[in-house]
UniProtKB/Swiss-Prot annotation:
ABC transporter domain location: 5-240, 250-496
GO cellular component: plasma membrane
Lineage: superkingdom: Bacteria
Entry similarity comment: Belongs to the ABC transporter superfamily. Arabinose importer (TC 3.A.1.2.2) family.
Cited InterPro entries: AAA+_ATPase, ABC_carbohydrate_import_ATPase, ABC_transporter-like_ATP-bd, ABC_transporter-like_CS, P-loop_NTPase
Subunit structure: The complex is composed of two ATP-binding proteins (AraG), two transmembrane proteins (AraH) and a solute-binding protein (AraF).
Organism: Rhizobium meliloti (strain 1021) (Ensifer meliloti)
GO MF annotations in UniProt: ABC-type L-arabinose transporter activity; ATP binding; ATP hydrolysis activity
PANTHER family cross-referenced by the UniProt entry: ARABINOSE IMPORT ATP-BINDING PROTEIN ARAG, CARBOHYDRATE TRANSPORT ATP-BINDING PROTEIN MG119-RELATED
Predominant location category: membrane
Cell compartments where the protein resides: Cell inner membrane
Protein name per UniProt: Arabinose import ATP-binding protein AraG
The enzyme's E.C. designation: 7.5.2.12
Length: 508
């Protein structure tokens, strides 16, 4: 089958960084083409060039043999190119239907026919297999539901080329299966799919071919993915072999550091209880909607508690106040780091120092020298890849943004408990191992760590103990010596947890 999408010698640089250098590869019509690489390898830059969001310094993109000269995202859209970014492009205050039909509403003489709009959108969503209320405000949807709306928007435009950037990072298993079925349908219709993911299982399941980028250059191009193995791809991504990505090792655990006693809230009505020992990494696993993130927000004080107590080293942590939780030694790295974790438009230095400024801001005046010293120290310690501490944090890869958030809390004096939600979502295999090493180092220093993840291999790989959540309650407690994938998944499923789970003693 003929080449339909071609990248020819694409180069793109920013001040202090060469993001892409002479990248060339092609994709056949009707193919699903994987794009992999470590964070910072150049994948997102290449996608931005394809989408018309940014222009390449040199090189050319061809679609069906025709050179493309985009000046804007609109130009790319008109050429049949749609990119679904990790940072969703929906308008929160508009409804699902309005977002899906934005700019092309049905009606006459400028008057929108809303009944026709709802009818058309309902029919198309049902046809695609997406169960979302077309009249619901996007702001009211979960992250996974918003992702499905974004995907539906691309499918409903009859695009010739669709690029998906980590599309399943916020999806449940059921939603992912719907997406995979859509991709198969688009493939059969001749649409080119550029599939950016760090999940090798998805790459091997969906893709016909694969390109690997490393440090802005073409590391490998595989026209037939069936002829390449996982270990080879990982080595091509990181430039070295990673024999054990998890790197777990036993540690000496201390006394109970974090104690949660019958805590509940509006979004987690059933009271839950658990303890985490000093030096322990406790994993929380469950399906989307199981209540994992809600638990973390209650413990941290971001959501209001209805009842219960949180104690650190036996001392009560005041309820409903992140500020007081931080002072008590409890910190949270949130699930959605783009919106809840980083301060967009601010530098790495400012993001790292934001929680510690009171320590070097006498009389309300920030000591910029101490702030710079702190940033440089943690950039080096956490191996943040950046040309300067002054760089805008939005220009960092996901893995480096996560390191900056960790650096923010490590710079805070007296942190005893770290709650980290989806620690490696959208992060490449090399950066994942670096994040895990940071967590192991913190645990070895006596910190109690709670890791919340929807990736079962991750939880099983790094946790000393796992609590499985199902429908807002703790359904099972499993020690590392008893880890079993089938048992954990069975406990996470609503129809199975009641008969297969072993409840922890702490739960009343």
């Amino acid at each position: 089958m003929q080449d339909f999408l071609e990248f020819q010698s694409i180069s793109k640089g920013y001040p202090g960084v060469q993001a892409l250098s002479e990248v060339s590869f092609s994709v056949r019509k009707g193919a699903v083409h994987g794009l992999m690489g470590e964070n910072g390898a150049g994948k997102s830059t290449l996608i931005r060039v394809l989408s018309g969001d940014q222009a390449a310094d040199t090189g050319e993109i061809r679609i069906n043999g025709e050179p493309q000269h985009y000046r804007s995202v609109r130009d790319a859209f008109n050429a049949g190119v749609i990119v679904i970014h990790q940072e969703l492009q929906l308008v929160p205050e508009l409804t699902v239907a309005e977002n899906l039909w934005l700019g092309r509403f049905p009606g006459k003489a400028g008057v929108i026919d809303r009944r026709q709009l709802i009818r058309v959108v309902s029919d198309r969503l049902a046809e695609i297999g997406i169960d979302v209320d077309p009249e619901a405000k996007v702001a009211s949807l979960s992250i996974g539901e918003r992702q499905m709306v974004e995907i539906a928007k691309a499918v409903m435009t009859d695009a010739r080329v669709i690029a998906l950037d980590e599309p399943t990072s916020s999806l449940s298993s059921r939603e992912s299966e719907i997406l995979f079925a859509l991709i198969d349908r688009l493939r059969s219709n001749g649409t080119v799919i550029l599939y950016v993911s760090h999940r090798l299982d998805e790459i091997f399941r969906l893709c016909n071919s694969l390109t690997v980028l490393r440090d802005g250059r073409l590391a490998a191009h595989h026209p037939d993915i069936s002829k390449v193995g996982r270990e080879q791809i990982i080595a091509e991504m990181v430039g070295r072999e990673i024999s054990n990505i998890w790197g777990w090792r036993a540690r000496t655990l201390g006394a109970a550091r974090l104690t949660v006693e019958r805590v509940s809230g509006a979004n987690l009505p059933q009271p839950i209880s658990f303890t985490v020992r000093a030096g322990e990494i406790l994993g929380f696993f469950g399906l989307i909607g199981a209540g994992r993130s809600e638990m973390a927000r209650l413990v941290y004080g971001a959501d209001r508690r209805r009842q219960g107590k949180v104690l650190v080293d036996g001392l009560a942590v005041p309820a409903d106040s992140p500020r007081l939780s931080i002072r008590a030694g409890v910190v949270l790295c949130p699930e959605d780091r783009k919106f809840d974790g980083i301060v967009q438009g601010r530098s790495i230095e400012e993001n790292m120092a934001i929680s510690s400024r009171r320590h070097f801001s006498p009389f309300g005046v920030v000591d910029k020298g101490k702030e710079a010293e702190l940033a440089e120290r943690f950039i080096a310690k956490l191996r943040v890849r950046t040309p300067s501490r002054h760089q805008d944090i939005v220009n960092l890869s996901g893995g480096n943004q996560q390191k900056v958030i960790l650096g923010r809390w490590l710079s805070e004096e007296g942190v005893k408990v770290l709650l980290i939600d989806e620690p490696t979502r959208g992060i490449d295999v090399g950066a994942k191992s670096e994040i895990y090493e940071i967590l192991y180092e913190l645990a070895a220093q006596g910190m109690a760590i709670v890791v919340i993840s929807s990736e079962l291999p991750e939880v099983m790989g790094i946790a000393d103990r796992i609590l499985v959540m199902c429908e807002g309650r703790i359904a099972a407690e499993i020690d590392r010596s008893d880890f079993d994938e089938h048992r954990i998944l069975a406990a996470a499923l609503p129809d199975a947890s009641a008969t297969t789970a072993t409840l922890p003693e702490q739960v009343s």
